[in-house]
Regions:
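Outer-membrane beta-barrel signature, preferentially recognizing the C-terminal barrel domain
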Residues: 5-67, 72-74, 92-112, 117-119, ...
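C-terminal beta-signal and adjacent terminal beta-strands/loops
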Residues: 7-8, 76, 81, 173-185, ...
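Outer-membrane beta-barrel translocator domains and adjoining extracellular loop/strand segments
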Residues: 12-18, 25-28, 78-85, 133, ...
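Short glycine/proline- and charge-enriched loop/turn segments
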Residues: 20-22, 36, 95, 184-189, ...
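Gram-negative outer-membrane beta-barrel transporters
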Residues: 65-75, 83-183, 263-267
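Extracytoplasmic gating/loop element in the C-terminal half of outer-membrane beta-barrel translocons
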Residues: 194-195, 243
């Protein structure tokens, strides 16, 4: 059981009103011009604070380990880009909105973590951990803070064949990933912006040889079954009169295919 309070000061560029960043659109929550926006520092920004709580239960005996932990982080004054423009640039034919960094009054991240370690034999050990997200949202808008898996399971099976040789298999299972509910204009996402990533898993194999007490060699393969996931684009649709780049929802990253590797580790 534990409780703590965290503090995060805004960066220099976020508090300097003379420092301006330009975004092509993804940083503009509700831009009506479709031409991108400027982000201006805000000297009145407050520091982010959070109250972090966790409660856990653990069982340990003869190499066995089982545990579950509930955690919740409540944020106040979380720093994000503003939701509405405070001004526009100059008198040119195409005007550009200007936003400021602002404090989001309240946000919350809450979930469960589980652990299970099993001593299968004197030479084989099986370790597991899982994280399950209950919520991760901006309390002002009700939207998700980021695109993350509903759950992530990591499982490792290790076999110490000889004193100087071991092999290992790793298994990672990612849960469903959902996009944000609203686009950067503050409107509900539609079409391809609602794309989700279905659950998928990755398997890896490796072996390590301790050549001497100072040098070891490791070789292996990640993503044994060559599971591929392709990035389809940015999360949300952007553009204007000259054309659009349609959003891809949660399909915003690549999952590398099968990869072989070898490494040399030394210690002194």
């Amino acid at each position: 059981m534990g409780i703590g309070r965290a503090y995060k000061a805004p960066s220099l560029y976020q508090t300097n009103p003379n420092y301006i960043l330009y975004s092509k659109g993804q940083g503009c929550y509700a831009s009506i011009t479709g031409t991108g926006c400027y982000m201006m520092g805000n000297e009145d920004l407050k520091a982010e604070t959070s109250i972090n709580k966790e409660i856990g239960l653990e069982f340990k005996r003869d190499g066995w380990l089982a545990g579950v932990t509930w955690f919740r982080n409540d944020y106040r004054n979380k720093i994000e880009a503003g939701y509405a423009p405070i001004s526009q640039t100059g008198t040119s034919k195409v005007k550009t909105d200007i936003y400021q960094w602002e404090n989001v009054p309240k946000a919350v991240v809450e979930g469960l973590e589980g652990t299970l370690n099993v001593p299968v034999s004197e030479t084989v050990n099986w370790t597991n951990n899982i994280t399950y997200m209950l919520q991760s949202k901006n309390k002002e808008t009700g939207d998700r803070l980021s695109i993350i898996p509903e759950y992530t399971l990591n499982s490792t099976l290790s076999w110490q064949i000889y004193q100087d040789v071991s092999v290992q298999s790793t298994f990672t299972w990612y849960g469903k990933q959902e996009p944000k509910k609203y686009n950067y204009k503050g409107q509900p996402v539609t079409g391809s912006e609602k794309n989700e990533v279905s659950p998928y898993s990755i398997l890896g194999l490796s072996a390590t040889w301790d050549v001497t007490k100072y040098v070891s060699l490791t070789g292996g393969v990640d993503n044994v079954f060559d599971k591929r996931h392709w990035r389809a684009g940015n999360a949300q649709t952007t553009g204007g009169d000259t054309g659009y780049m349609y959003g891809a929802g949660a399909e915003t990253y690549n999952e590398s295919g099968r990869t072989w590797y070898m490494s040399v580790n030394t210690q002194f």
